Amino acid sequence: MITELTRMWLTRSTKPFLFKKEYDQELPFSDCDGLGLYVHIPFCRSICSFCPYCKTLYSEEACSRYIDALIREIHLAGSQIPGKKIVTSLYFGGGTPALAADRIKEIIDAIQEHFIITQGIGIELHPENITPRTLHILKEAGITKLSIGIQSFQEKFQKLLGRTGADMDSLKAALSQVPFETVSMDFIFALPSQTFGDLKADVDAAFEAGANPVALYPFIDFTFTDSVLPSMGKKEKRRLLDQITRYCLETGCTRSSIWTFAREKHASYSSMTRDNFLGFGCSAATLLRDQFKINTFSVEEYIRRIDQKKMPTALTLRFTPRQRMIYYLFWTAYSTRVDPRDFEAFFGVPLKKMYGLELRLARLLGFAEEKDGVYSMTLKGAFYYHYYENFYTLSYIDRMWGLLRKEAFPEQMEL
């Protein structure tokens, strides 16, 4: 109800987000500035009960067939424009992309036939992947940024999450032996019985191990996962988030996004804050000026579509102008700041003309501050953004991903 009312208010319409079983064979990305790239590799050695992302158990044969299809999808999209398109960054997610480490260079080479990457190449890794051999392979392939899914260094939380422990000494040794431009370590907060002391210990250990930045993601209980962990209460969650935020800021960190804190000012790492992006692989999403599309979650159906030289799109949303504005603002807010000049450059209309009332309310309620024309979230605003994002995730992402896990190509979905 909260997300539905918010959508109607901000879009000035009762029209829902309507996703249909349709797609454009040719994607209109040639004139998209600030374009990012995402590649999804869904294979895992074992399945974590809390993880909501598209994944499947690894087999060498299935992974090989999938990578072959993935490279063909890259060429299918990339060959639609003449010359090479300048893009910001490339990010590999999963799953466990390191299970395809020996073919990462092949994928990057295919992408570089069509795109010029200007802000580096990142990959997410399981702690078990942090070995000198794997890191050497990835660095030689062109990877410059790592995102390591630690979740927690503490055994009690590792057991809750069904994870094996990260060997701190081995982790530090491997990262020291094979350095990267950026090493982000990801943690989950708001786990059952988790205290500020627990979270502080994880953050301190991460920085000591060479992480910069550190990312703190809230635990969300998706309906379609096998997780049985209870959610933390709102007051406890806010207290924990405020405490760890103050601690990070007081110890000299900068807040580079809603989730991330960095010791070095420019050590940002995010796959989220892109104005437009192209996604390759099963479950990968694409966001362009007037549409959002998401690929099928089925590995076999994905390969079948690519074999037919067709886009593997499962659902497409055609934005109204205000829907696109809200989508832009929601994801831009992850950086904790919104610059009206960027909004006007993207949409050709002043932000205050479209959402002047909402901006005034945000300031009056203490959610945001304005300085030099730029709006920045306060500590209070950041918490309520987290809080609202939980509703958004369960109302939108949970429903969509839950459906796509069951049906390769649904007829439509209203959100």
Predicted segments with their positions:
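Basic, amphipathic "hinge/linker" alpha-helix immediately C-terminal to the N-terminal HTH DNA-binding motif
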Residues: 321, 375-382
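Short amphipathic alpha-helical interaction segments
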Residues: 349-363
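Canonical Radical SAM [4Fe-4S] cluster-binding loop centered on the CxxxCxxC motif
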Residues: 31-68
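Short beta-strand motif preference
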Residues: 37-39, 148, 377
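A short, conserved structural fragment
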Residues: 363-373
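Flexible, acidic/Gly-rich N-terminal and inter-domain linker regions that tether
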Residues: 1-35, 45, 83-84, 365, ...
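C-terminal scaffold of the Radical SAM
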Residues: 34, 58-77, 88-349
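Short, amphipathic alpha-helical interaction segments positioned at domain boundaries
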Residues: 382-415
